[in-house]
Amino acid sequence: DGRNDTITLQVTVTDGDGDFAQQSVTVNTVAGPLFNDAPSGGSSVVTTDEGNIPGMGSQHETSATQPFGAATDGSFKMELHGADATVSIGGTELKVENGKLYHNGVEVTADAAVSVPGGAHGTLTVTGMDADGTVHYTYTLTTPVDATGNASNRPGEGDTGRGEAVHADAFDVTITTTGGTATGQITVDALDDAPVLSTLDTTQTTVADGEAALTGTLSFTPGADAEGAQVTVEVEGQTFTGTKANGEWTFTGGSDGSSFQLNGTAFTYTRPSSNTTDGRNDTITLQVTVTDGD
């Protein structure tokens, strides 16, 4: 009942003819803390960036993506009302005892961090807890996120998709004390990557009558969502579609006898004979579109 009490035990022993002996002992009880209040907390949202996944992302930064990396630090607050607790993060069980966070008997710190398995697109690592119940963690995005039909509740940055926030991962949090249970979730958003077309230039300013080949430089990166990416080149009414296999792009199209080839970053567009000997002055425009996998 949370009160300090005095307990008195009095014992009397009486023999067969009425003689007796009597003694008493007094015990003072001191009330300990009561943990009847239910815990609360356990939720947070963090943002990562697909464009900064090492070896995958386009690294193309905008005002919306500049502050974010593939790895991000986050935290959530627990209110335990002084009680010890069992904390489950993504199914990994930790203990709070005397204001410190433990995993398998070892205090969780930056030097003794705990990895939480089960991430769909990255890894979650718990790195410690402050005295006020704030749990710290790091999430690292390791694989691209399909943005198709997967928009987060936060605005994007236009039709290209770069900077669009998409849902990447979620880890359930359960906090249990003698006062009850609280549930929360660590939610991870990823800023969608987009292709970058860095160079499109020709090595010729004019093409002589009868000359079929137009050469130049084309360089681009599909970004993190490279799987399923496509490149199209539209020129002189023809559309060439590029697909990548074994590290090389191959273009098909050109129903009029024309062709488009890309060797590394060097391209060659070969005009059909009907366009090279018609005696007209022409303007040749190449329009290149790079579309990533989502």
Language-model-derived ranges and their functions:
Residues D1-D294:
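Acidic/polar, solvent-exposed loop/turn segments
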